[in-house]
């Protein structure tokens, strides 16, 4: 009886090991198959441009292409993206600015926005104050931005007027901002550059926060070099009603940016119906850039693949 029991026990262990090995093999095969299917799905979309012109930023595809921004640009182009944006372009070495511009030109890609600033004055109480020191800094930075734009083939540059000046009424602050932006436009307009004003939701100290406010300031500046950067993530947080507000401010919109809410990640990760928003933007005839100013919802290469697939899904609207 003892021998029989031992034999039975050995057989059970062998069966258990076989089942475990089979399950492990099946799991491994399943993961490999999924990886191949994912790679195949990306290759199927290989180099096929999106309907709209989405612009990624440095670091978004670093796990797939490496830390070098140039290599990320080449990878993104192979995935169908045709533009980049780079908030920190003004802080890059001159040779790197040129190299990025040359790479974009060779690939037939576009440069989106970079931020006009040398010392983060856009996060301070600056243009709203009306003080000459801030006007001088802005003028200096706008002149430098003209040279940077030449190197990287840029057309759009982001300007944020800064924080509230609590010692002045809103109307005085608005007048100060309009004056400053008219001065900036006079520098940029001869070069065909467009300053896009970004209304933000990051903190309550920021002066520029709403679409109607930004629209009014653009109308008052009255220059083709002063337009509205409609960041849909910020506008969703501050006011919602995205499609209606796009329509109301359409004549002054020079650039669009993307980010789902909550979380500020790629489309399909939050509450916003980007597939429908993109369809609306497309049917209105928008030919400009939509900046992907958001993070990746998931880490690593898998997260980057998920991001690409999210854009393919959101861009697959039916007309």
Where do the language-model regions lie?
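Glycine-rich, proline-tolerant flexible connector loops at the mouths of alpha/beta enzymes
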Residues: 87-105, 161-165
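Histidine-acidic metal/acid-base catalytic patches
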Residues: 2-63, 67-77, 153, 208-230, ...
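A short acidic, helix-capping loop that chelates divalent metal ions and anchors anionic groups
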Residues: 121-127, 165-169, 204, 237, ...
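Active-site acidic/histidine proton-transfer and metal-coordination neighborhood
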Residues: 20-32, 46-48, 107, 127-227
